[in-house]
Amino acid sequence: MKLSASFAALALLLPFVQAQSPVWGQCGGIGWTGPTTCTAGNVCQEYSAYYSQCIPASQATSVTSVSTAPNPPPTSHTSTSSAPSGASTSTAKLNTLAKAKGKLYFGTATDNGELSDTAYTAILDDNTMFGQITPANSMKWDATEPQQGQFTFSGGDQIANLAKSNGMLLRGHNCVWYNQLPSWVSNGKFTAAQLTSIIQNHCSTLVTHYKGQVYAWDVVNEPFNDDGSWRTDVFYNTLGTSYVQIALEAARAADPDAKLYINEYNIEYAGAKATSLLNLVKTLKAASVPLDGIGFQSHFIVGQVPTGLQSQLTTFAAQGVEVAITELDIRMTLPSTPALLAQQKTDYSNVIKACASVEACVGVTVWDWTDKYSWVPNTFSGQGAACPWDQNFVRKPAYDGIAIGFGN
């Protein structure tokens, strides 16, 4: 079935160019030439250097945003960047708590370079602490098909084998994303038929290789811009919106038992981006395209966790999909302080409570569990301390916040 006509309307969600931007309209960012003020009752919220949006004034202090960059290779971050973190007082194990609350798992991302750190793996391997793992980089396109038709799975296999040996669920991440593409894909001058075949072959080969091992796949990652328009990448530019259907159908054919997700950030609050994704979900479901879940990445800032997160989870779940928190971290400006750590504890607790309160929210994954290997300092200058454990593997107050969120 052709979906392009239905999807085309979503692509028209463009910034408003007038004297003032209305609610959810763009109001700033590098290269923006439109209005920089908002209509009455709304304020201009800066999300990044590239995008600001008009939001209701009542939400101005509770909305957060982050534009996820390609994950750099993990590096060890020294303790000189932050003050002593304090320590958790909870003795509970987080995956045990999650399952007691009716969730499938509490999990973490990891990366291959970290697995040589025996102190790190001693904690990672505890399946009462983590019941699920996500490979941060080793299943992405540049890692698995660096040359056309030449696949390599050694990195992904290492993490898949770790999940199997520890009795953990494995999340596949990801099949189709605009970033971390090999140049033969991103710079390719393909016809629609050629790129369709390339997507089908990549998704089919990748998902087939891990058939029976993966609980859920992030099949399509980050298809929308923050203003709700479609990202203009090689996939969209060549195939329009149909690339989403092509990828999902290829993944379903390769592993009928794996849950198929679209994974996105900045959908944790109501706005143009969340609306576009919600409309996409409705269109896909109406056309019987296989889609089982929506991943809420949840890269937050201390003190700015959206108060409407639970409502957003519920809204998407009402479309007949499961939902999950897939990449949780809550960063702060360094150095950390007792006040920031206390707020971070509250923030983690509130995110967990939101998932715990929604039956269709199957679990929570942190985007690595220790500040030692967090992606944040390499991506956001002067920020860090985003994880529940500090760089010395000491549990922070945030750990207690997670336990509290699960009802402990």
From Swiss-Prot:
UniProt temperature dependence: Optimum temperature is 70 degrees Celsius.
Catalytic activity: Endohydrolysis of (1->4)-beta-D-xylosidic linkages in xylans
Region described as Disordered: spans on this chain: 64-89
Skewed-composition ranges (Low complexity): 76-89
Residue ranges constituting the GH10 domain according to the UniProt record: 88-405
SMART domains, per the entry: fCBD (SM00236), Glyco_10 (SM00633)
One record GO biological process: xylan catabolic process
Protein name per Swiss-Prot or TrEMBL: Endo-1,4-beta-xylanase A
Gene assigned in the entry: xynA
